[in-house]
């Protein structure tokens, strides 16, 4: 039987509050993270992802207190990212109640950190977040046409996004959180080309992120190769039964959901 597609609300947190902007700019307050996490748990979410959107840029530590309070309220897997630099942060997150840690900027700066974390805790604990954007005129071209960015999409690296996902998979990362910076917050749908390219390169689960606006946007991402689908504003600002609507759309397209 096919593995069920996971539906994952994402909580972007800044100073203890959930926010959501378009293309990571102009953040808007979407509420209390613990309250929202509780709502999503009750609403049928399969997992939650919690990203401290200021941690890497402002070099601040992840808000461990919010993680602890969230973990006390929800009983579905919780992935936490933002400011994760190595074994010490992952250890602390797990102790505060996270199930998985997501790493981005620190892994780009020092890929060996992937090996260190997976050796210490196992692959299942580590998610590599890849903030990919299409290369633009004047950028260093990449063979896939997508480059890795860091610091919430603000800094281009010139690293090929598909090659980076493959390297991380080879190093033992458990899954890839594949976020399209171009599609993020637009509500125009996922970047299907990006998903297809990474799916062809790796054998580990892919969580598609960036661009969801309506339930109909989710099945094409699964068809393109995503094992899980992640979104923020469509859940934060949509009707209370949005997770159920998304699962119905995926099920109606012929895919298994939980």
Curated annotation (Swiss-Prot):
Q: In which pathway does it act?
A: Amino-acid biosynthesis; L-histidine biosynthesis; L-histidine from 5-phospho-alpha-D-ribose 1-diphosphate: step 5/9
Chief location category: cytoplasm
Query: Where is this protein found?
Result: Cytoplasm
Q: Which InterPro entries match?
A: Aldolase_TIM, His_biosynth, HisF, IGPS_HisA/HisF, RibuloseP-bd_barrel
Task: Give the CC-aspect GO terms.
Answer: cytoplasm
Q: Does the keyword Cell division apply?
A: no
User: Does this entry carry the keyword Amino-acid biosynthesis?
Assistant: yes
* One BP term from GO: L-histidine biosynthetic process
Give the E.C. number(s).
Answer: 4.3.2.10
Q: Where is the active site?
A: 12, 131
Q: How does it assemble?
A: Heterodimer of HisH and HisF.
UniProt family annotation: Belongs to the HisA/HisF family.
Query: Record's NCBIfam families?
Result: hisF
Q: What does this protein do?
A: IGPS catalyzes the conversion of PRFAR and glutamine to IGP, AICAR and glutamate. The HisF subunit catalyzes the cyclization activity that produces IGP and AICAR from PRFAR using the ammonia provided by the HisH subunit.
The protein depicted here goes by the name Imidazole glycerol phosphate synthase subunit HisF
Organism whose genome encodes this protein: Paenarthrobacter aurescens (strain TC1)
